[in-house]
Amino acid sequence: MAANTSAETPLPVGEVSRLIGGWIDRLGAVWVEGQITQLSRRPGAGVVFMTLRDPSYDISVGVTCYRQVFDAVADVVSEGARVVVHAKPEWYAPRGQLSLRAAEIRPIGVGELLARLEQLKKSLAGEGLFVTERKKALPFLPQLIGLVCGRASAAERDVLENARHRWPAVRFEVRNVAVQGVHAVPQVVQAVKELDARDDVDVIIVARGGGSVEDLLPFSDEQLVRAVAACRTPVVSAIGHEPDTPLLDYVADLRASTPTDAAKKVVPDVGEEVERVRALRDRARRCVRSVIEREERGLAHTLARPSIEDPHRMVDERADQVASLLDRGRRTLGHLLDRADSELSHTHARVVALSPAATLKRGYAVLQRADGHAVRAPDEVTADEVLRARVAEGEFTVRVDV
């Protein structure tokens, strides 16, 4: 169509609407899934009007059907129900409005819903959205708590009352939203994103007081699960539910079984904390007292030792021992010196008695030839040979006379 138009040769609105209607007619009948809203069954009217909505994308389309088509499922289908309709798209050219004319309506059973949720759960788990490593720790004492819940609901009352009872100073930033029906998902997602964007919000609680599987479907919506996974603020899921667990429980940083349980897990009890501090203080006091008493006993035992009790006595005892040993040493050394002196004198006397000088003193002389050899026999000398004679008091020369 674009090739056949220009600013100079535009198509009239009616022609464009006619072309769109032709394309829609060629689409034929299709099966469409959605959630029923704005159901209108006027008494006596042969046509039923409703809106079929996709809560994940907040897109709606009008649906009409004959009364007998709706009456076939009227007992199990009402506003908020998820259904599959076999319908033919219709284009109302005067208003440029798309609608569906349903020929068959089938409610989606609980079993089928749970099967779809299980498939979605596996898909999201495969992306790693539920792993423990992604979980963020909650602050010990949050100053400001974001609360997403229904307006004037029991869930809101339970969280606020229990939290303030445990810690009166805690503050809340409450976002009241639809917690079931077609508007629940976009409102809850928007509230979570708004609270996560605030730097002063320490933790976010998403609370609802339970319900059927159909009522809790918004808390298993993929859009909400991904929004919570993207939060930088810790998120607590507090959906009081049946055994079938909403997917919000898996992606949240902490799961609480009920709104009351969420208040207890998020906010510490001031009384319990004061008692815990008191108990720790008493325990510390007992530990310190025990250490002091043990050290005092050790010190008393040490002071009771003789060396510490009367240190001078030990010194005096050792001084007497030193004096006794010193005197003993002197006596022993004196005896040794006296004996050594006596032995030395005796040895000296023997040496003197046996020395040549002693012999000379008795009148003997030593004759030596000129070469210094001592004369021992007469035949060792010749006539007129000069010899040197050594006596006790000196020496002189003699001549041999044969």
Curated annotation (Swiss-Prot):
Enzyme Commission no: 3.1.11.6
Main location: cytoplasm
GO MF annotation: an example: exodeoxyribonuclease VII activity
Catalysis: reaction(s): Exonucleolytic cleavage in either 5'- to 3'- or 3'- to 5'-direction to yield nucleoside 5'-phosphates
Single GO biological process annotation from the record: DNA catabolic process
Domain of life the protein comes from: Bacteria
EC category: hydrolase
Keywords in alphabetical order: Cytoplasm, Exonuclease, Hydrolase, Nuclease
InterPro entries with a match to the protein in the record: Exonuc_VII_L, Exonuc_VII_lsu_C, OB-fold_nuc-bd_dom
Record's GO cellular component terms: cytoplasm; exodeoxyribonuclease VII complex
Entry keyword annotation includes Cell wall biogenesis/degradation: no
Subunit structure: Heterooligomer composed of large and small subunits.
Similarity field: Belongs to the XseA family.
Protein name (database record): Exodeoxyribonuclease 7 large subunit
Taxonomic classification: Bacteria, Bacillati, Actinomycetota, Actinomycetes, Kitasatosporales
